[in-house]
Each structure stands twice: as C-alpha cells, then as structure tokens.
C-alpha cells in the first residue's frame, strides 16, 4: 500500500510523528482485507495486538510517498506475526530516487472471542488469506 505524508502526519520538526508509522501499518493491514471484500473480524472473534517491536530508521517528511510492505513471519492456530516495513519511494519534488527504509515493525496478533477475549482459532478464511501474503 502507498500513502503520501501530509501536514497532519508531521510533528513540530516537520517529520512524521513516530506513532503515525503504526497507523500506516494498520491501514495497510486493513486494506489487505478490504481488497478481499472481507473485514478483519467476524461474528465470533477479532484480531488484537499482543506485542509490537518497532525500529525507526530515517524520518519521512512532508510530501514524500511511502510504501508499506507486509510479510507473514509466523502463522499459528491462534496468532499471527507480521513483519512490516515502510519505505520512502518518492520525494515531494517527484524526482526519481532510490527507495530507503524509514520504519520496520514486528507485530504479533492474537485472534480472540468477542465477548470473553479468550484466544480462539483463527478462522480458515483468514488463514487462507494470510497465507497468500
């Protein structure tokens, strides 16, 4: 998924506010499901974040175009671990440039029952979709 950095994404230094990288990653994960005409939840359960490891490299800034790349690191019965990286692929000037990494994260999601929040098996449909990443 690609997105552009807007004023609302930046801090007082003019670079992307650190928490927004997590928002970009969440949007990419959601967009993955939306493109399959599926919500990332069902009547029985929902994905919840168990843990996040985040690494910040070079800050992105206003007008740059970012590309969020997602890989499955581990897919188990009740959880999935995703590795997501964000690259700057275009400057605001629109001139050609070599992409560079700005952020990387490893996020562990559990699938839990909506009412009890107890872990339950990831539904077959979700496992099939995630396996295709």
Curated annotation (Swiss-Prot):
GO BP terms: namely: lipid metabolic process
Active site per UniProt:
11
Looking up InterPro entries in the UniProt record yields: 4-hydroxybenzoyl-CoA_TE (IPR050563), HB-CoA_thioesterase_AS (IPR008272), HotDog_dom_sf (IPR029069), Thioestr_dom (IPR006683), YbgC/YbaW (IPR006684)
The alphabetical list of record keywords is:
Hydrolase, Lipid metabolism
- Give an example GO molecular function: fatty acyl-CoA hydrolase activity
Q: Which Pfam families match?
A: 4HBT
Q: Might you give the EC number(s) for this enzyme? A: 3.1.2.-
Output the PROSITE patterns linked to this UniProt entry. Answer: 4HBCOA_THIOESTERASE (PS01328)
How does this polypeptide assemble, per the annotation? Homotetramer. May interact with CagA.
**Role noted for this protein:** Thioesterase that may be involved in phospholipid metabolism. Displays acyl-CoA thioesterase activity with lauroyl-CoA (C12:0), myristoyl-CoA (C14:0), palmitoyl-CoA (C16:0), stearoyl-CoA (C18:0) and benzoyl-CoA, catalyzing the hydrolysis of the thioester bond. Has low activity with butyryl-CoA and octanoyl-CoA.
**Which family is annotated?**
Belongs to the 4-hydroxybenzoyl-CoA thioesterase family.
Q: What is this protein called?
A: Acyl-CoA thioesterase YbgC
Organism annotation: Helicobacter pylori (strain J99 / ATCC 700824)
- Recite the lineage of the species: Bacteria, Pseudomonadati, Campylobacterota, Epsilonproteobacteria, Campylobacterales
